[in-house]
UniProtKB/Swiss-Prot annotation:
Keywords per UniProt: Calcium, Cell junction, Cell membrane, Disulfide bond, Gap junction, Hearing, Membrane, Metal-binding, Transmembrane, Transmembrane helix
Record function comment: Structural component of gap junctions. Gap junctions are dodecameric channels that connect the cytoplasm of adjoining cells. They are formed by the docking of two hexameric hemichannels, one from each cell membrane. Small molecules and ions diffuse from one cell to a neighboring cell via the central pore.
UniProt keyword Calcium, yes or no: yes
Intramembrane residue ranges: 2-13
Mode of membrane association: Multi-pass membrane protein
Entries under InterPro entries matching the protein: Connexin (IPR000500), Connexin26 (IPR002268), Connexin_CCC (IPR019570), Connexin_CS (IPR017990), Connexin_N (IPR013092), Connexin_N_sf (IPR038359)
Binding site for Ca(2+): 42, 45, 47
Disulfide cysteine pairs (residue numbers): 53-180, 60-174, 64-169
The protein, known as: Gap junction beta-2 protein
Gene3D superfamilies (UniProt xref): Gap junction channel protein cysteine-rich domain
Gene Ontology MF annotations: calcium ion binding; gap junction channel activity; gap junction channel activity involved in cell communication by electrical coupling; identical protein binding
Length: 226
């Protein structure tokens, strides 16, 4: 699946989202997917090529690079975006199932009076209620979990969010402790902090949307006749 396909699927989910959900999707597309596709390769394209160590020992440079960068930042962010977007696909499948059921009932004549034709069923906005409410709420909950887990993994794996100019490595087969230099550390630090900040904003938006959905759910129950 490429980014265009993912965008078209999530765009379909956006039609049935709350206002906060629409803001989250906008942030996801503009500040994460677009930035990752357009700018990430320019910033991180020289990762291993310009990782220089002051030794000529064969294999030392590769081992040190693997020690400090076990997973490429770009690949980790791409995996994060895929995992964060996956719960929204569950909502898309649930909406598609509901429409399929309505089409089936329409063809049988059970809901002929509710819709003019099948095209109206396709374009109708599906309300977030009933079982769809649970699917939608669960998807947001898992988005928060995935975002938090990836931020924690990123922090642990790279020992923080700031890129050092110089790192020391004594892994085998290096003959002793060698100095290794990272290319453009300031630029990479700024980019990393930006991506982490956007992840934090997405978490806040998801938590806000969860609170909104629960408040609306509770207020709806309180209005029902006893």
């Amino acid at each position: 699946m490429d980014w265009g396909t993912l965008q078209s699927i999530l765009g379909g989910v956006n039609k049935h989202s709350t206002s906060i959900g629409k803001i989250w999707l906008t942030v996801l597309f503009i500040f994460r997917i677009m930035i990752l596709v357009v700018a990430a390769k320019e910033v991180w394209g020289d990762e291993q090529a310009d990782f220089v160590c002051n030794t000529l020992q064969p294999g030392c440079k590769n081992v040190c690079y693997d020690h400090y960068f076990p997973i490429s930042h770009i690949r980790l962010w791409a995996l994060q975006l895929i995992m964060v977007s996956t719960p929204a696909l569950l909502v898309a499948m649930h909406v598609a199932y509901r429409r399929h059921e309505k089409k089936r009932k329409f063809m049988k004549g059970e809901i002929k009076n509710e819709f003019k034709d099948i095209e109206e069923i396709k374009t109708q906005k599906v309300r977030i209620e009933g079982s769809l409410w649970w699917t939608y709420t669960t998807s947001i909950f898992f988005r928060v979990i995935f975002e938090a887990v990836f931020m924690y993994v990123f922090y642990i794996m790279y020992n923080g969010f700031f890129m050092q100019r110089l790192v020391k490595c004594n892994a085998w087969p290096c003959p002793n402790t060698v100095d290794c230099f990272i290319s453009r550390p300031t630029e990479k630090t700024v980019f990393t902090v930006f991506m982490i900040s956007v992840s934090g904003i997405c978490i806040l938006l998801n938590i806000t949307e969860l609170c909104y959905l629960f408040i609306r759910y509770c207020s709806g129950k309180s209005k029902r006749p006893v």
